[in-house]
Amino acid sequence: MGGCEVREFLLQFGFFLPLLTAWPGDCSHVSNNQVVLLDTTTVLGELGWKTYPLNGWDAITEMDEHNRPIHTYQVCNVMEPNQNNWLRTNWISRDAAQKIYVEMKFTLRDCNSIPWVLGTCKETFNLFYMESDESHGIKFKPNQYTKIDTIAADESFTQMDLGDRILKLNTEIREVGPIERKGFYLAFQDIGACIALVSVRVFYKKCPFTVRNLAMFPDTIPRVDSSSLVEVRGSCVKSAEERDTPKLYCGADGDWLVPLGRCICSTGYEEIEGSCHACRPGFYKAFAGNTKCSKCPPHSLTYMEATSVCQCEKGYFRAEKDPPSMACTRPPSAPRNVVFNINETALILEWSPPSDTGGRKDLTYSVICKKCGLDTSQCEDCGGGLRFIPRHTGLINNSVIVLDFVSHVNYTFEIEAMNGVSELSFSPKPFTAITVTTDQDAPSLIGVVRKDWASQNSIALSWQAPAFSNGAILDYEIKYYEKEHEQLTYSSTRSKAPSVIITGLKPATKYVFHIRVRTATGYSGYSQKFEFETGDETSDMAAEQGQILVIATAAVGGFTLLVILTLFFLITGRCQWYIKAKMKSEEKRRNHLQNGHLRFPGIKTYIDPDTYEDPSLAVHEFAKEIDPSRIRIERVIGAGEFGEVCSGRLKTPGKREIPVAIKTLKGGHMDRQRRDFLREASIMGQFDHPNIIRLEGVVTKRSFPAIGVEAFCPSFLRAGFLNSIQAPHPVPGGGSLPPRIPAGRPVMIVVEYMENGSLDSFLRKHDGHFTVIQLVGMLRGIASGMKYLSDMGYVHRDLAARNILVNSNLVCKVSDFGLSRVLEDDPEAAYTTTGGKIPIRWTAPEAIAYRKFSSASDAWSYGIVMWEVMSYGERPYWEMSNQDVILSIEEGYRLPAPMGCPASLHQLMLHCWQKERNHRPKFTDIVSFLDKLIRNPSALHTLVEDILVMPESPGEVPEYPLFVTVGDWLDSIKMGQYKNNFVAAGFTTFDLISRMSIDDIRRIGVILIGHQRRIVSSIQTLRLHMMHIQEKGFHV
């Protein structure tokens, strides 16, 4: 019976047994969320409750075995009717309570077990209360009390229970509220029951003080309304700080609910059993969080508590961007084993890495050059006369090439090794020196270069022969380039004499010239650079005016003889006309010919067929008409935009048959399709480049030979070709003319045949069969073709592997000009489409958003083609929808490197995918970059998946948040729900995560595409952070 038993009751008039004194006074368990206002079991003295009338309720007090009082009130006036006996408590202070709970323990006699009381005995009693701000003393007015409830017993006892010494104790709890005054009274009304009130406990509930997630929450009283919660903001424990605002909600039953936010231990402190403790000496914690303190990394120490960073030992340093978890390092020792190799034009220095790298991987080298005379103690800086390839500072590889050195000179090269902490050390940088004496047999440098004259497109130069030629001079090499395009591209020519006339230059443009001499012993070094500027149109006109003035003056001098004067003017005028005509002819030739290449300055070399009112005029202007009898069609090889594509043979006059592909226009075509078909032929006819598909010609003539139907593409005939040919008609004298084609209707476009078809299908068919250098060769061919188009001011708009054709020699050629448009001379110009489908996966963001195309958008597409080639024809962005692709690119996501892709190629892809189109590389730069890779295949050996070392130049690494754990990284990108997936799959370090591909992300259970995209994008950023990008921007 609730764990507390009343053994006996004292019977009045024979109804109760005496109460046993074995009543346990501390039987009630009080929860820590209850505040007790009254508990009769703990009162040591008399309760002093008031009874009305006096002979109603009786107070009985007994002592238990611990000599503690047991206070009981009982009443059993069941023999008399109309009972109204009241028992009132003393005044009870409500404290902070808004709602109180009354717990009553009592026994009640079954009326049926008492004889002769059926009309007067009751089995319930009533509970009342009254609020007041102070005690009323003995005054009692029942009508001032409010009824709480009628209390009935769950179990009642009988005479038999008394005989068997069985006590049935009832426990009832009632709640009262809201309580607004300072206190209250309770009253119990008996209306004729036989009852013993064993104990009364009055309490209210609270949410007790607690500590959750390192945040303290005070005692909180819940609201009266059980459906509402009280929001409580916590305060962090000592040495902790908020990560997110800590909150708890207090429920009506005194329970804390819905924990939100948390506190974390500050730097230098760790969590131990719900509080933050300072890190011990020799340990540190660099970041606020609930991780443990870590032992100081090698070569660092601390003697204090609560340390956030360990101090480096003497002679060791920590770079600015080194994480606190990284060991302290020191500068490297000097490089070793310096050797050199010299020829007529270049000096190659090589060395071994230092024996002590200082514990770092960001090792770089610098080469300092000094020129020394016979006395090596007197040296001077080499100045800017020498060129170092790739540079003389910040070298990553342990070699450098020196150019433009002078013969007969002693050069001393000091090679220094440095790392990320070298600048923090005050000790002199160790170096290894080597002295090289240049070839005494090679010729010395030439003398000063002079400009003899300059015209609008030409410059005449002369110079002094070298002081020491050491043999007969064979010739001079002159290298020159536009000053504004320095180091991008250059031209060269040769001269037998110490003078030259350079033609084909741009007007009013500064050029830089370098000259060296060649003898039987080899080349000299290049001279210092000399700058000269071509003339403009105004200067040429002034020269002509000067010539006229001289002629006129000479004419006036012969005024004495009229006949002689007349003859003089006639002869002079004729010579003048002849000279001018010759000069203009020569100038025209120079304008069109420069070092063997035709140039047309200021003239747009591509003509848009849309400028022709009749598209057939453009076709005849740019495409060669082919006699249909020379074409033999063999089979269908595919379907194009306008019809089917067949393979066949073309017989050329005086030559053997060549394989060709024939594009046809399907029957029942619309006028717009006919115009577009003509337009593509007109476009292709203007191109002549080994990496652009070659147009052999078109068939558009009205008359058609009587050739067998089986010679044509069968489905081409079924599509309506025969219906477009007029039937043969009779002629006088018998016979008939051959069938005719309606006027102006295009029939066929004939192009060169590419045996291996489209590049994407070809790569998928030969997955993994090619070397990296072969793939780079394919990419170089595509870039060369696109450079040709870009130089003509032409935008392709649909560059993709499916539109690249491959011949039997693996030569790749750009094709499919259906979407192409002309680009104006303005370098910032872009073409705006008027509609039509855009290939989203290959198209630059600005072209998708604003339908603006430029050579820069073609560069973006070229980056996608690179990815297709290196992945052997995989679909870009895999199964992502077009909308997901657009959103991903806007969020900064870029395709990861395909498996086995060299880092240099993926870096080029990323440059092509720059969001700002002006930052993307030009096709000229791309071709030059790929040429360098082909000439230096070792640059292709480093794969993206191999680049897992720390950056070699911390100052050049982009900013990136530093995370201690993989979980922190996932939380930062709001992907914390996948922590267990990463741990279960073994991806517990950033080294492993940086290697993950999209397939790995799917494999560990990331199903949602949006989540895959966010994680892969962050991994790309992480991987770039771990890579060393030697210089910002794109360089060739």
Curated annotation (Swiss-Prot):
User: What quaternary structure, including any partners, is listed in this protein's UniProt entry?
Assistant: Heterotetramer upon binding of the ligand. The heterotetramer is composed of an ephrin dimer and a receptor dimer. Oligomerization is probably required to induce biological responses. Interacts (via SAM domain) with ANKS1A (via SAM domain).
Enzyme class label:
transferase
What EC number is given for this enzyme? 2.7.10.1
Q: Supply one GO BP term.
A: ephrin receptor signaling pathway
Tissues expressed in:
Expressed in brain and testis.
**Which residue numbers delimit the Protein kinase domain?**
631-944
Known role: Receptor tyrosine kinase which binds promiscuously GPI-anchored ephrin-A family ligands residing on adjacent cells, leading to contact-dependent bidirectional signaling into neighboring cells. The signaling pathway downstream of the receptor is referred to as forward signaling while the signaling pathway downstream of the ephrin ligand is referred to as reverse signaling.
Q: List keywords of the entry alphabetically.
A: ATP-binding, Glycoprotein, Kinase, Membrane, Nucleotide-binding, Phosphoprotein, Receptor, Repeat, Signal, Transferase, Transmembrane, Transmembrane helix, Tyrosine-protein kinase
Question: Catalytic site residues?
Answer: D798 (proton acceptor)
User: Which stretches face the Extracellular side?
Assistant: 23-550
Please give the coiled-coil regions recorded for this protein: none
Residue numbers of Phosphotyrosine PTMs: Y606, Y612, Y831, Y978
Q: Which family does it belong to?
A: Belongs to the protein kinase superfamily. Tyr protein kinase family. Ephrin receptor subfamily.
| Residues in the Cytoplasmic compartment per record | 572-1036
Which residues of the sequence carry a binding annotation for ATP? I637, G638, A639, G640, E641, F642, G643, E644, V645, K663
Q: Where is the SAM domain?
A: 961-1025
The reactions it catalyses are: L-tyrosyl-[protein] + ATP = O-phospho-L-tyrosyl-[protein] + ADP + H(+)
> Where is the motif (PDZ-binding)?
1034-1036
| Limits of the Eph LBD domain | 34-212
Glycosylation sites per record: N343, N397, N410
In the bilayer, the protein is annotated as: Single-pass type I membrane protein
* Membrane-crossing residue ranges in chain numbering: 551-571
Q: Where is the signal peptide?
A: 1-22
GO function term, MF aspect, one: transmembrane-ephrin receptor activity
Q: What is this protein called?
A: Ephrin type-A receptor 6
SUPFAM superfamilies, alphabetized: Fibronectin type III, Galactose-binding domain-like, Growth factor receptor domain, Protein kinase-like (PK-like), SAM/Pointed domain
